[in-house]
């Protein structure tokens, strides 16, 4: 009986983690107790959130600071160790609690150690028994295998637990990124609508200002007409009310003035055909926005390559170029410009970059195979800006003429009385409702296309070169022309 009670007490003070008697026991809020080393090692595995952990047995969460030493339990363990190590108790453990005989046999049916009197009792009659020494090694090996199996299963369980936590963290990151992308895209859509609204209001305000100005002028004309008539009426009234001499003096001139008076009617604008506002094609705008977003996925970092032949000043970070007039030894003071190339060179793939051309009155940009423009006393020549010469570019001339440069057309040129045929580029006019401050360039080497986008106008396509013949590497191309304001390469976040 005493041994059974002792075993029950031992079970109560055994650590559920290491299955040994508790060492420096710590108790949780749920009432369970563990060795200090065991529960501390378990902290990392049972981390929940914000410093909270869970009990390995009941999974109830608890704050880290609520771990408290259990002195009473530690005293019980200490007393139990003393009892188990005493010779008397050791003798009691080795002897049958019922008969007092030594436990030398093992009953295979019941799985317990018994004494020789137990073997002969009615309870164990007919059971197969063996000496404890004979079965101890076998069961020790079986238990060792079972222990290894459980340890492996525990490792597998811990790995599964870690996998779940990792998947949970991964999902949180994905959802967070999706939220960020959704918010960013809807913000861009709202920006597009705000921009369209602002443009429409500016057009309306401009129309209002123009009409009111004309109406004000018309009103002033009517006031002058009324005042002129009032003066003439006063003259007539004075003559009628005065003497005969006053009546007849210059009367023919007055009558002539009255006959020449023509009532000028004010010009009205009610019947003028006004532009009717139509809501923007949201579907089309979204499609344009989608196309711009798609090509922006291929944004590359482009830098400018300095050239000693170019009258260009490139910034230290090689991201900005502006025109600077220089003195050439052969020509004297001559405005000449070759343009500058961008790096890297492109032999394959899809590439996108953006250029800020704000407030510039002239510029040319795109891609080219090499620099072929020739110096000219009158400024940069455009004869070579043609696809067949390796240039796929668009540009701005005279602060308002946007053009794309296609392959040459033949035209006649008369110089010094002689006739010659010149081949200039086919200049394709480009019409834009909103002038671009920022131009996007997209090169698809395999598709043989170069596209230009008006980023200022929500990414609408400006022009597209198709069936381009890229026989070799091509480079980004930039020419600020003779306008001293800079061209600046943009970054994705600018």
Curated annotation (Swiss-Prot):
Can form homodimers and homotrimers. In addition to lower-order dimerization, also exhibits a higher-order multimerization and both low- and high-order multimerizations are essential for its restriction activity. Interacts with BTBD1 and BTBD2. Interacts with PSMC4, PSMC5, PSMD7 and HSPA8/HSC70. Interacts (via B30.2/SPRY domain) with HSPA1A/B. Interacts with PSMC2, MAP3K7/TAK1, TAB2 and TAB3. Interacts with SQSTM1. Interacts with TRIM6 and TRIM34. Interacts with ULK1 (phosphorylated form), GABARAP, GABARAPL1, GABARAPL2, MAP1LC3A, MAP1LC3C and BECN1. A zinc finger (RING-type) spans 15-59. GO terms for biological process: activation of innate immune response; autophagy; defense response to virus; innate immune response; positive regulation of canonical NF-kappaB signal transduction; positive regulation of MAPK cascade; positive regulation of NF-kappaB transcription factor activity; protein K63-linked ubiquitination. One of its GO terms (molecular function) is zinc ion binding. Its EC number is 2.3.2.27. The modification N-acetylalanine is found at residue 2. This is Tripartite motif-containing protein 5. Capsid-specific restriction factor that prevents infection from non-host-adapted retroviruses. Blocks viral replication early in the life cycle, after viral entry but before reverse transcription. In addition to acting as a capsid-specific restriction factor, also acts as a pattern recognition receptor that activates innate immune signaling in response to the retroviral capsid lattice. Its main location: cytoplasm. Residues 280-494 form the B30.2/SPRY domain. The keyword Metal-binding applies. Degraded in a proteasome-independent fashion in the absence of viral infection but in a proteasome-dependent fashion following exposure to restriction sensitive virus. SUPFAM superfamilies: B-box zinc-binding domain (SSF57845), Concanavalin A-like lectins/glucanases (SSF49899), RING/U-box (SSF57850). Residues 132-222 form a coiled coil. Belongs to the TRIM/RBCC family. PANTHER family: E3 UBIQUITIN-PROTEIN LIGASE TRIM (PTHR24103). Zn(2+) binds at residues 96, 99, 118, 124. Keywords: Acetylation, Antiviral defense, Autophagy, Coiled coil, Cytoplasm, Immunity, Innate immunity, Metal-binding, Nucleus, Phosphoprotein, Transferase, Ubl conjugation, Ubl conjugation pathway, Zinc, Zinc-finger. The keyword Metal-binding applies. The lineage of its organism: Eukaryota, Metazoa, Chordata, Craniata, Vertebrata. A zinc finger (B box-type) spans 91-132.
